[in-house]
């Protein structure tokens, strides 16, 4: 079992690295030859040129480039508020997908373009659409430490318990991403403390796995169940022992002793 945890630790670090590549707020990789004239104008934020293109060919309003990105996707990824407003006033498709099933709202959140995201939400963008990884806009806000964006999404009825393909709610995702401020924010907004992922790992197990003693402390204060077992019958305390995280093991042990004393 110790070997399994050792492997899990290396795998966990690899996953963190790959997560940073996938979820960090980067825009689209743009090649000029993939774009139409209207796409180029939108990326530059040239609202007058975009309007000129639409006057000539109105059907270009939702035109896709060679990677299935619409004008609105590209505009949101680059934070071109004036062009976003223009496109919405012309009634472009607001919940349209790109090749990864991401909507313009997802892309605005992914790239941390808050002004664009707010405009989209105020025009009725759906915050609960999932991409090919089953992530929602809230998952991307969580990864990019966006409490302001997360709050805005929740105020527009984003599902705080949405599951991605790994079974992670935004809370579990925040713990996996080591985002303590977001963890605190989600708990204050009534996120389910007892959520489990596809391996039946609890929030506490994930916090232990990532050696996040401050998040462990926060979860213990919330009286999370320390006796829950994952798919392999391991508890959060077992995780601390196998990873040799002695200070976290001590935190859990002290909490366990308090529970046992209260039942005497």
Swiss-Prot record:
Pfam families: Ank, Ank_2
Intervals holding ANK repeats: 67-96, 100-129, 133-162, 166-195, 199-228
Keywords, alphabetical: ANK repeat, Repeat
Domain of life assignment: Eukaryota
SMART domains cross-referenced by the UniProt entry: ANK
InterPro entries (UniProt xref): Ankyrin_repeat_domain, Ankyrin_rpt, Ankyrin_rpt-contain_sf
Family annotation (PANTHER family): ANKYRIN REPEAT DOMAIN 36-RELATED (PTHR24147), ANKYRIN REPEAT DOMAIN-CONTAINING PROTEIN 19-RELATED (PTHR24147:SF64)
The protein's name: Putative ankyrin repeat domain-containing protein 19
Organism annotation: Homo sapiens
